Every structure is written in C-alpha cells, then in structure tokens.
C-alpha cells in the first residue's frame, strides 16, 4: 500500500486549484516540482507523518471511487484519525494539516454523494476541516447539514470556532428571519452547556451576549460556575451600551437569586438603582443573619427601607440600616488602633520641620484667615472622634478668633468632630444655638445637620432643630439651617423636608446665595430620584431670575441642584435640557452641560465623554475674534463677572469627563491623558478645572503620577490653577496620611508662606490628607469599587463645582460649602461580627486586589498580603480575605461591617 501511496503522491498538486482559495501556495512546474517536493518532504516529514499522510490521501481517494460500500469505513477512519490526534495548543493537528489540500475535493465528493447517513457523516468531517480554511463560514454550514452528533467529540477548539461563526451568522440575519435562527439556537443550546462544563464560562457568556440571549444562561449554570459567570457579566457591564448593561446585571442578579446568594443580588440591585427590587430581595430572604448583613450594606450605601413592623428582628434591622452604631463601631476601631488622642493643627502642619529663617509658616501673627484654616484642619483631622483641643473644651475662646463667616465655619466644624454621634453630639452643640452672634448660631445649626449626616434617627432631631430657621429674617441663619438639612437628609428623598425647603428658593427675601444653597440642599436630599417638585421649583427659579442675577456666581448651584436630582439617570433629562433652552447664554450652556454630566455620572459612557471633549475644544475660534476687540473692555468684564465668562461651561465639561469616567479603570486612564493635554494647551477656564477633575478621578487614591502633575501646577502662574491644584492634592490623598504628600505640602507651605490664599489651600489640603487621622475616605465607590454612593458623589460635586470659582466662593465668604465633603466621608475599615453582632476579632489577609475575571480554576484574588486581626483599615485598591477556615463570611466582599458564621465543617 505504501508503494502505491508513494506513486500517487505526485498527483496531489493537480488537486490544488480546488484548494487554492484556502491559501495553498503556487507550485513550480513539472519535474523540478517533483524533485524539490521530494527533497522537502524527505527533510520535513518523519516516517510516521509520511505514513499518516499517505493513509489520509488514500482515504480521500476511496471516497472518490464508485464503490459506495467503501465510504462508511473510509469516513469512520478519517474521523478516528482527526479525533485521535492529540493537539498541541500551538499548532494545527497533523491530520487536519495533511487533509487541507483535499478540502475542495472533499466538498465535491460531498456534493456528488447520495443523500443519507454517509452524506451527513461527510458533512461532519468537512465541518471540522473548515476550521483550517479561512472561508465563508463553512464550518457552520456543514455542521448544520451534518449528522448532529455530539459537539464535545470534536474538541474544544472546534466548539470555539463554531461559536464564533454562529455569532456572525446571527448578526447577519434579521429579526424577521426567525426560521433561519432556529437551527442556530439549537446549536447554541449545545455549545453553552459544553463551555460551562469545560471551564470556559466566559466564552458561553460572550456567545449569548453576541446573540442577545443572555437569559438562557440561568438554566445551564451550576453551583460551581455561578460565581465566575456573574463576575464576568458584571465586569462586562462597563463596556456595553444602554440597555444591554442593565440586561446583563439583571441576568446576573437572577442567577444569584437562583442560588440564594442574597447579598450579591442586593449589590446588583443597588447598581441598577432599582429600589423596588432592593426591597423585594431584602424581604424575600428568610435568614435573619443574612438580612442583617444586607442591612449593613444598605446603611453603607445610604439606602433606608421602610420595613413593616412584623418583620422578625425589626428593631435590629432598622437600627443597622440607620447607621446608629456607626459612631460607636468607629470609635472601637480608633481605640484598637490607639489613635484616640485629639490632635491640634500644629501636629499636622509640623512647622518645626520647616527650616525657615524667619520662623515657620505657622508662626506669623494670628490672622483670621489662618485661624479659619485651622478650624477646618481641626475638624477634618478629628472628624468623628468626638473630642479635640480647640472646640470641645472651651469653644468660645476659639470661635472669637474668627471673623464673621469664619465664625460660621468654625462653629460648624464642631459638627464634624462629633460626626455620626447624634445623641451625644447635639447636646454639645446646643449651647451655641443661644449665642448672640448670628454667624455662630448659623454655624451651630449647620453643625447639627452635619452630625446627622448619614445617620437616621426616628426622632428626626435635625428637622426639629433646623426647620424654624429656614425662613429666618437673617439670610445668614437661613444658610446654616438649609445646608444643614441638606447634609442631614442627603439621599433620603424625604417629602416633609423638601416641602419645607422648596418655598425658600422663590422667597423674596432670599439672596442669590440662599436660593443657590437651597437648590443644592434639595438636590442632595433628592439625589438620583428625579423628584418632580424639586425639578419644577428649581427650573421655575432659574426662569424667574434676571440675566444679571444669573451672572451671580451663586447661580451655578441652581443647575447643580437639578443635576444632583437626576444623578445617574441617563436619558431622563431630555425634558429638562429642552426647558433650559429659553435661558440666555452663557448660563444656558453652563446649566445644560452640568445637568448632562450629572445624569451620566459614573457610567463610563464613551459617547458622552466625546461630546464633552468637543465642548472643551470649542473656544479657540471665538477667542481669536475677540482679541481684536478692546482688550481693556475684556479685562473689566473679567473683573466684574468672572463666572459669566463664555467658557464657564467648559470647566464643567472637564469635571464631567472625570465624573463619567471615574467608574471604570480604562476610561479613567484615558481621561488622565486627556487632562494632560488640556493642562498644557487649554484655555484658562479649562486649566482651572483640570486639577479638580484629577481630584475627582482619584479621590483618596494618592497615585504618584497624579500627585506629581498636581504638584507641578501648584506653582502655576495663574493663581486659580495653583489654588485648585493644592486643594486637589488634599482630595487625592484624603484620609491616607500619605507621607510623600505630607512632605510635598510642607514644602508648599514654606513656598507660599507669604501668600495667605495659597497658604489657606495648603492648610486645607494638609487637613484632608490626615482626614480622621487617616481612617476615613472620601471615595464614593465601595464594595470592591462596584457601587457608587450617590450621596458621596453629590457631596464631592458640591465642593468641586464651587471650586470652579474658587476666588469668590471658597476664598470669599462661602467656605462653609466645604462641609459638603461630610456627605462623602466614610470609615475605610473592616469590622467583623458574630451572628449576635458582637465584635469578633479574626485574622484576615489584606493585600492588593487582583483582577481574576475570566480566569480558569480558583486563582488568588489578592497579592502581597499581610495578615492582621480585625478591625483593620483597607486602603484604596486593597482587598481582604479571611485567613482562617473556622468562620465563613455571609458576604463575599469583606469591607465595612461583615457578619461571620461558624464553619460547620471546621472540626471535621
């Protein structure tokens, strides 16, 4: 047989025209071809390979002969050869390689065969061969006419190839062609279970996403695969457009519920921002311990569910959701870390380390501006610790070292020190409510609001204390009480509080500042809820204001209130944008841009970012035309109405890029590059906004490249760029105690020792860096960076939008707006409890989180870990896992408050 085979070998090239489309090379002619061919083959093919090749060729020949009785054994043998070739992952299996030139001939043979079993059998073999030919989806074509035997028998590579062709074919068929889609669906129903069983869950998901049939996943998933599938689906969410992203989340949520993983399902319902679903998941869970864990998660996210009183352990659940214990748990952590000792601003400034010939930057005369800075620093550093050395002992002495509005902020800082401690805190603030100074009184009102931030209390002390002052004759009193209510009820969407506040906007006595703060407070309370009353009242206020009033710098808070009301709501803002069309420029584009970016906050929406970049690059033509006009006139205009500059909305667009991209790593990286360009080549309005955008994209995450950029621009020629850069450094490092940043800020303090405004910013940044002595964070993302807290984003935006006009707002009289940051303050700790909610110290490994999406097996989720005993602090990008098998966590993400259960199999 071998002889015969060898004689026939030269015949092979004559079939090449048929196989040519598959990519065989052109051959030289006649005799040289035979000689060259023989030589090459001698070198290339080992004896075994040669035998295999000849055998395969003979089988193909047989199929071409007239004797049909030989077909079946020949096909059987071909199939055996193809299957038994153990494939190395890097090269094409030998039988497929040798059969490739005969592909065309096999197709001809197939066409000429009589219908029946053999013909279908041949189709199977051609389908497998088609993998090696880059052609017209023939792998799929022949599969569909083949014998329909099990996919698995042909191996993984074949299944993967087929899946790709199914997806392409599906997209070319219209919805109308349902009949043609049927056989494809049948194939998909074979492919998906195969992938699930062979560690290729992500390929199954990809296929179903391509053909938009994600719901089919649920029935094929088993206990072992669901976690991986859901992880893959949720990590795809950032990369698919509306409405597919919510379809993926809902699919993953369905899978979690199928396996009774309630905490994970709840997390996805919060991502979807679907409150009915949240309530449904919470109430359908019958395990009280898991319900308590979910209550902790809701409390952290700032969501409160009104439970019916007959729910088991109603009081406990309500208390957990209300964050009543937040303060005592936080103080327990502080005691554990031994950081209860109150700090004074000088401990933070470390003026003794400055080698200054004229004494340190802090040793100049007591100026009101520096005392104000110290009030903020003192508040930030001792936030939530309940004691300090300036205010809690004998506060009056310190308060009177401040002037006017400074007193307001100084008094309010007491609220920050007593943060979350509703019962103990209000009694300490109470005495200042009787002060003869309106500013101190107003500050004390704001402090009452701050103390209640993020904590619910059924007695509603904040509402009771502050409601009388909302329409007070003095606008100063209004400011403190309204902003206080905004912070105390942020995210609650409480109708009673809103009905109290909304009339203030239209009140004739309200200054523009009060109207602005009211819009802000209402936006914070109704954050992300699309509340109709808030929308209509703010829109009405904007319509009623004259053009000059809208040029007031505080007018920017009106559209911000609108934006916060629609935070993350996407297309729901079309009507508002249409309503704003009647407002005159430049306020219109400012308001439009601001509402638009809020609606897509954290969505990672690429198209929106592109629109914003267009806005950023708009200004150049108009600038050149303006330059011919009288420059002096332009200067006067700048002085009078800086915020009404035509480019004001560009600053918002820059912030918007950060706001949209911050939810997702790749988008954030791309935004960083863009900001680099804007800083170098942008207009002044743009450059002032870039540091703020950098702060937003990296809150409480002191990345060196961002710090270096900010450090460079903290010496910028444009003072507003340098103010914003310095403050941004504080936000980027907030609550981290980052030593490198602290050193940078000390150098800046020396550099700006003679410039009170810059020094004020440096002090603020120093206070933020040591926020809560390094135990708090301002980052709006939690639960492994999956969930964005809308209340936190509202707080950050309030501050950053105000910084767009830093000179008139923050360095002017409205520095109290910095307390917006309170809404974003959260302890960055991990505390473990047993089922009775008693603290339970266990050892945990804390390390850098590793992305394990789509990896096979059970890869490690953290790297470079250290083992600690809870309670512990978690830095940005760190993840914790239990280091003992004695307990099992009720939720897979160890962050915040976690309940542990005894592992029933531990003693075995």
Curated annotation (Swiss-Prot):
Domain of life: Eukaryota
Region Required for interaction with UBLCP1: start-end pairs: 708-903
Gene Ontology MF: a single term: enzyme regulator activity
GO BP field: proteasome-mediated ubiquitin-dependent protein catabolic process; regulation of protein catabolic process
Keyword Metal-binding: no
Modified-residue entries (N-acetylmethionine), positions: 1
InterPro entries in the record: 26S_Psome_Rpn1 (IPR016643), ARM-like (IPR011989), ARM-type_fold (IPR016024), Proteasome/cyclosome_rpt (IPR002015), RPN1_C (IPR041433), RPN1_N (IPR040892)
Residues modified as Phosphothreonine: 24
GO cellular component: cytosol; extracellular exosome; extracellular region; ficolin-1-rich granule lumen; membrane; nucleoplasm; nucleus; proteasome accessory complex
Residue span of region Disordered: 1-52, 623-645
Residue numbers carrying Phosphotyrosine: 194
Keywords: Acetylation, Phosphoprotein, Proteasome, Repeat
Pfam families linked to this entry: PC_rep, RPN1_C, RPN1_RPN2_N
Ranges of Low complexity composition bias in the record: 10-21
Positions of post-translational Phosphoserine modification: 16, 29, 147, 361, 363
Tissues expressing this chain: Found in skeletal muscle, liver, heart, brain, kidney, pancreas, lung and placenta.
Chain positions with N6-acetyllysine modification: 551
Biased composition (Basic and acidic residues): 24-52, 623-643
Record has Phosphoprotein as a keyword: yes
PC repeat extents: 409-442, 443-479, 480-514, 517-551, 560-589, 692-723, 742-757
Entry's family note: Belongs to the proteasome subunit S2 family.
PANTHER family per the UniProt record, alphabetical: 26S PROTEASOME NON-ATPASE REGULATORY SUBUNIT (PTHR10943), 26S PROTEASOME NON-ATPASE REGULATORY SUBUNIT 2 (PTHR10943:SF1)
Quaternary structure annotation from Swiss-Prot or TrEMBL: Component of the 19S proteasome regulatory particle complex. The 26S proteasome consists of a 20S core particle (CP) and two 19S regulatory subunits (RP). The regulatory particle is made of a lid composed of 9 subunits, a base containing 6 ATPases and few additional components including PSMD2. Interacts with RPGRIP1L. Interacts with CRY1 in a KDM8-dependent manner.
Chain's role: Component of the 26S proteasome, a multiprotein complex involved in the ATP-dependent degradation of ubiquitinated proteins. This complex plays a key role in the maintenance of protein homeostasis by removing misfolded or damaged proteins, which could impair cellular functions, and by removing proteins whose functions are no longer required. Therefore, the proteasome participates in numerous cellular processes, including cell cycle progression, apoptosis, or DNA damage repair. Binds to the intracellular domain of tumor necrosis factor type 1 receptor. The binding domain of TRAP1 and TRAP2 resides outside the death domain of TNFR1.
Name of the protein: 26S proteasome non-ATPase regulatory subunit 2
Protein species of origin: Homo sapiens (Human)
């Amino acid at each position: 047989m071998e002889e015969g085979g060898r004689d026939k070998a030269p015949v092979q090239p004559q079939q090449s025209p048929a196989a040519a489309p598959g990519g065989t090379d052109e051959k030289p002619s006649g005799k040289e071809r035979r000689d060259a061919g023989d030589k090459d083959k001698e070198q290339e093919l080992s004896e075994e390979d040669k035998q295999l090749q000849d055998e395969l060729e003979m089988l193909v020949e047989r199929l071409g002969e007239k004797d049909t009785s030989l077909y079946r054994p020949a096909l059987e043998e071909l199939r055996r050869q193809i299957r038994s070739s153990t494939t190395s992952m890097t090269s094409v299996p030998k039988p497929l390689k040798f059969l490739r030139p005969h592909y065309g001939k096999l197709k001809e043979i197939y066409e000429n065969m009589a219908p029946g079993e053999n013909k279908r059998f041949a189709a199977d073999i051609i389908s497998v061969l088609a993998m090696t030919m880059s052609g017209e989806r023939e792998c799929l074509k022949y599969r569909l006419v083949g014998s329909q035997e099990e996919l698995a028998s042909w191996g993984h590579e074949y299944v993967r190839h087929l899946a790709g062709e199914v997806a392409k074919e599906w997209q070319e068929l219209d919805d109308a062609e349902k009949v043609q889609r049927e056989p494809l669906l049948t194939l998909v129903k074979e492919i998906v279970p195969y992938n699930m069983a062979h560690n290729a869950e992500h390929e199954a998901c990809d296929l179903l996403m391509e053909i938009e049939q994600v719901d089919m996943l649920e029935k094929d998933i088993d206990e072992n695969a669901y976690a991986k599938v859901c992880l893959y689906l949720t990590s795809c969410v950032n990369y698919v457009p509306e409405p597919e992203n919510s379809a993926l989340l809902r699919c993953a949520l369905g899978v979690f519920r199928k396996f009774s993983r309630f905490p994970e399902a709840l997390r996805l319902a919060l991502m979807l921002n679907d409150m009915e679903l949240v309530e449904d998941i919470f109430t359908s869970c019958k395990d009280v311990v898991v319900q308590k864990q979910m209550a902790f998660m809701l409390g952290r996210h700032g969501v409160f569910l009104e439970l019916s009183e007959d729910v088991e352990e109603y009081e406990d659940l309500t208390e957990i959701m209300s964050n009543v214990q937040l303060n005592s748990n936080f103080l327990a952590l502080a005691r554990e870390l031994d950081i209860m000792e109150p700090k004074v601003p000088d401990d933070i400034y470390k003026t003794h380390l400055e080698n200054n010939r004229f004494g340190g930057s802090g040793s100049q005369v007591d100026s009101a501006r520096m005392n104000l800075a110290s009030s903020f620093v003192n508040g930030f550093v001792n936030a939530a610790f309940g004691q300090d050395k300036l205010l809690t002992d004998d506060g009056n002495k310190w308060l009177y070292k401040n002037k006017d509005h400074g007193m307001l902020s100084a008094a309010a800082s007491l609220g920050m020190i007593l943060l979350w401690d509703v019962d103990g805190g209000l009694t300490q603030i109470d005495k200042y409510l009787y002060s003869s100074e309106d500013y101190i009184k107003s500050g004390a009102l704001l402090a009452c609001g701050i103390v209640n931030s993020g904590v619910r209390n059924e007695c509603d002390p904040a509402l009771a204390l502050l409601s009388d002052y909302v329409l007070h004759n003095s606008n100063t009193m209004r400011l403190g009480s309204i902003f206080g209510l905004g912070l105390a009820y942020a995210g609650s969407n409480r109708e009673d509080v809103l009905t109290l506040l909304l009339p203030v906007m239209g009140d004739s006595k309200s200054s523009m500042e009060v109207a602005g703060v009211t819009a802000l407070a209402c936006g914070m309370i109704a954050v992300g809820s699309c509340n109709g009353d808030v929308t209509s009242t703010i829109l009405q206020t904007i319509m009623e204001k004259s053009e000059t009033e809208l040029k007031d710098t505080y007018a920017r808070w009106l559209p911000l209130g609108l934006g916060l009301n629609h935070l993350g709501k996407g297309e729901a803002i079309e009507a508002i944008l249409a309503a704003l069309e009647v407002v005159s420029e430049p306020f219109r584009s400012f308001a439009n841009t601001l509402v638009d970016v809020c609606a897509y906050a954290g969505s990672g929406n690429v198209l929106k970012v592109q629109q914003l970049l267009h806005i950023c690059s708009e200004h150049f033509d108009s600038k050149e035309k303006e330059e011919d006009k009288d420059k002096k006139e332009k200067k006067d205009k700048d002085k009078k109405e800086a915020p009404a500059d035509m480019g004001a909305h560009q600053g918002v667009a820059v912030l918007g890029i950060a706001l949209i991209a911050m939810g997702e790593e790749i988008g954030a990286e791309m935004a960083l590059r863009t900001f680099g360009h804007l800083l170098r080549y942008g207009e002044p309005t743009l450059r002032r906004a870039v540091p703020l955008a950098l702060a937003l994209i990296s809150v409480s995450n002191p990345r060196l490249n961002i710090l270096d950029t900010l450090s460079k621009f903290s010496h910028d020629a444009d003072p507003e760029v340098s103010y914003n850069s310095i403050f941004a450094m504080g936000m980027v490092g907030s609550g981290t105690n980052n030593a490198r940043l602290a050193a940078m800020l000390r150098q800046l303090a020396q550099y700006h020792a003679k410039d009170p405004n810059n020094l004020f910013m440096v002090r603020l940044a120093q206070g933020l860096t040591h926020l809560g002595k390094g135990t708090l964070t301002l980052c709006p993302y939690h639960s492994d960076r999956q969930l964005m807290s809308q209340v936190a984003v509202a707080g950050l935006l309030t501050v950053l939008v105000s910084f767009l006009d830093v000179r008139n707002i923050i360095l002017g009289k409205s520095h109290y707006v910095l307390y917006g940051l309170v809404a974003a303050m959260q302890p960055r700790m991990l505390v473990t409890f047993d089922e009775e909610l008693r603290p339970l110290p266990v050892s945990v490994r804390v390390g850098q989180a590793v992305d394990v999406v789509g990896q096979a097996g059970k890869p490690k989720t953290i790297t470079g870990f250290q083992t600690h005993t809870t309670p512990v602090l978690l830095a940005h990008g760190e993840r914790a896992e239990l280091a003992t098998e004695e307990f099992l966590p009720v939720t897979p993400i160890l962050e915040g408050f976690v309940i542990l259960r005894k592992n029933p199999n531990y003693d075995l």
